């Protein structure tokens, strides 16, 4: 069972809570059109992050620039039903960057094909600080010849950090491309304490 460590202060004593993260992906029909109901931009150590949610859970997390933030603020729509997912995401991301959270519990509701969701679920099952390659994921989902398709599904991930596509490295242990650049990838892996290791797990 994959676990989550969340530290909270109670007086001078630190309490640790471990949460199951094996079923974060909400089951949605591929034909079901789900539009984001609300969005928010907030600051993190790696830059401004845009998050979007629908009535089922978090649907988007990406890096944005200042111009995009201005457009988002002007076109913002709020929905109480989805707003709770944004608050939960901002809290958990903050804990992740402070080093007190090693996995996430916010429900995830991205749109994608069944194959893409299999790949994203395999990524979610990676432990904090754990590496894998496209080939490892293909083996994990019983599609050993679908390495390129796995790479495409990894690239189609729209919930960065939480669905940890940054943990995918080359089979030789070298860093491979990342949508937000190798420097951010190094930052995330360094935060997780594995940036200098060549560990392929699965």
Identify what each model region corresponds to.
Residues 1-145, 191, 195-202:
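Basic nucleic-acid-binding alpha-helical/helix-turn surface characteristic of O6-alkylguanine DNA
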Residues 145-189:
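Short glycine/serine-rich loop segments
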